[in-house]
Structures are given as structure tokens and as C-alpha cells.
A protein has these predicted regions:
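A short, Lys/Arg-enriched interface patch at domain edges and termini
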Residues: 47-71
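Polyanion-binding surface elements
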Residues: 1-22, 55
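Intrinsically disordered, low-complexity regulatory regions of eukaryotic regulatory proteins
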Residues: 28, 43, 66-68
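Structural detector for helix-capping/boundary residues
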Residues: 9, 29, 46-47
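Major-groove DNA-recognition helix of helix-turn-helix-type DNA-binding domains
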Residues: 15-41
């Protein structure tokens, strides 16, 4: 059975970003997540990460089509 939820550490590995960047994505609401357990650890549903990646592809495509290669 595939893993449904990812830790922020998993997200950093998947996206090759820092822990601070992953936390900022969650805090801003750009990457939906939930807090679980007594220590409030963040979990990101795999489908939400995939949706985020698809949104980033779409944004990148739009920038390229607009001639904005510097992002």
C-alpha cells in the first residue's frame, strides 16, 4: 500500500528544497498540510504534493509562454 502522508523531511527530499522552504510553503498555504500528534508534526498528503507540483508546472509554462525566463 503506497504511503498516503509525507513528513516535511520527505517533502524536502522530493522537491530538493530546504526544511525552511518546505515549512514556508505550508505556512503560506501554498502546500496544504495537517498537524498531527501531541507535538503537532506536519504531514502533507501525497495527492496535495502532486497537485502542488502540477501547479508549479502550469506556472512555469505560463512564464515561458510570456517570455519570462528568469521567474
Amino acid at each position: 500500500m503506497p504511503q498516503r502522508f509525507l513528513t516535511l523531511a520527505d517533502v524536502t527530499d522530493e522537491l530538493n528544497i530546504s526544511a525552511a522552504q518546505a515549512y514556508a510553503l505550508v505556512r503560506s498555504g501554498e502546500l496544504p498540510a495537517i498537524q498531527v500528534g501531541g507535538r503537532g508534526q506536519w504531514r502533507v498528503e501525497m495527492s496535495e504534493l502532486e497537485a502542488y507540483i502540477q501547479r508549479m508546472y502550469a506556472q512555469t509554462r505560463q512564464r515561458i509562454e510570456a517570455g519570462d525566463f528568469d521567474g
